[in-house]
């Protein structure tokens, strides 16, 4: 059984990460474990920037966005020599367990620490993209969804006033879940996501069909990286004759106080991660990652969840079918 654990946040930040850290710290202290907070993810682990946390370290953190430990992208962690330094830093402090909050890249780093250094690592899915396998939802997804829907509502006000077409670019990397959920909740007329082949002419045809039915304005939700938004807006305006404007929501989607569901999910996952570390699991095959499936906490080997065939969450085809029916 572990006696000292570390906790870090890695990669892009997500609302609810502080709640997850709090869940880990409070659950670990209740079990008599020492907890170290590692600053700025794997970079801080390499630079030996760790601090012992107590109950008061996480007081008033559950409602705060971002991550008070800080986060960073640290591609140098792929270097085995860099990982050796990180492992040395943990071993010198007697840290034998680690909770990593982040996406699949963060999971990969945790798995290597387990396989190379014997550290018992558990990953928690912290990303607004909802693109991590092994879980129905990631920490931060529902807060980002609220942010996107609020933006869509505001754009609808001005689009309807000017009989304008608005294109909204939503984060998600190579996963369309955030765009899809926002399109349904925001009543978007059209949607473009990575899981479904996107062609400009098909989108224009749908918009023209809407205009023919008397539609005077429209909202198009599109996942980032699918097209250049300004160029697409000009193309739609040229083909339809309707004024068209693009809006890139950007990093505002990552900020803000986490909504209640994200706070609950993060707290449950944090406590569950500590339970895993306290149990007699076999870590010879690597670390574990936590998920929620049908509202129940589950875990799986990290190696399974980051395997190429499982590297992202399953496409919510039923959501897409629903969205299409409502256009």
Curated annotation (Swiss-Prot):
GO terms for molecular function: 6-phosphofructokinase activity; AMP binding; ATP binding; fructose-6-phosphate binding; identical protein binding; metal ion binding; monosaccharide binding. Pathway: Carbohydrate degradation; glycolysis; D-glyceraldehyde 3-phosphate and glycerone phosphate from D-glucose: step 3/4. It comes from the Bacteria. It comes from Yersinia pestis (strain Pestoides F). NCBIfam families: PFKA_ATP, PRK03202.1. Catalyzes the phosphorylation of D-fructose 6-phosphate to fructose 1,6-bisphosphate by ATP, the first committing step of glycolysis. It catalyses: beta-D-fructose 6-phosphate + ATP = beta-D-fructose 1,6-bisphosphate + ADP + H(+). This is ATP-dependent 6-phosphofructokinase. Mg(2+) binds at residue 104.
């Amino acid at each position: 059984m572990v006696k000292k654990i570390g906790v870090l946040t890695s990669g892009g930040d997500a609302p609810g990460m502080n709640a997850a850290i709090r869940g880990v710290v409070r659950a670990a202290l209740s079990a008599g474990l020492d907890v170290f907070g590692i600053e700025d993810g794997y970079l801080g682990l390499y630079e030996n920037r760790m601090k012992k946390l107590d109950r008061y370290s996480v007081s008033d953190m559950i409602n705060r966005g971002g991550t008070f430990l800080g986060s960073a992208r640290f591609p140098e962690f792929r270097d085995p020599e860099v990982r050796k330094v990180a492992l040395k830093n943990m071993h010198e402090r007697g840290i034998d367990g680690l909770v990593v909050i982040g996406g699949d890249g963060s999971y990969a780093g945790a798995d290597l620490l387990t396989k190379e250094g014997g550290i018992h690592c558990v990953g928690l899915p912290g990303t607004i993209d909802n693109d991590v396998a092994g879980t129905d939802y990631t920490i931060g997804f529902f807060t980002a969804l609220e942010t996107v829907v609020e933006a869509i509502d505001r754009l609808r006000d001005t689009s309807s006033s000017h009989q304008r077409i608005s294109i909204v670019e939503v984060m998600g990397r190579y996963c369309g879940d955030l765009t899809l959920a926002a399109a349904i909740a925001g009543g978007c007329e059209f949607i473009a996501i990575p899981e479904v082949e996107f062609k400009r002419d098909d989108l224009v045809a749908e918009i023209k069909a809407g205009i023919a039915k008397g539609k005077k304005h429209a909202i198009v939700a599109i996942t980032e990286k699918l097209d250049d938004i300004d160029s697409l807006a000009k193309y739609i305006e040229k083909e339809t004759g309707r004024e068209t404007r693009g809006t890139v929501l950007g990093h505002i989607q990552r900020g803000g106080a986490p909504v209640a569901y994200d706070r609950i999910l993060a707290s449950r996952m944090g406590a569950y991660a500590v339970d895993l570390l306290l149990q007699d699991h076999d870590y010879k095959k690597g670390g574990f990652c936590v998920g929620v499936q049908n509202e129940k906490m589950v875990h799986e080997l990290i190696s399974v969840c980051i395997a190429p065939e499982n590297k992202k969450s399953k496409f919510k085809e039923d959501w897409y079918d629903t969205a299409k029916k409502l256009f």
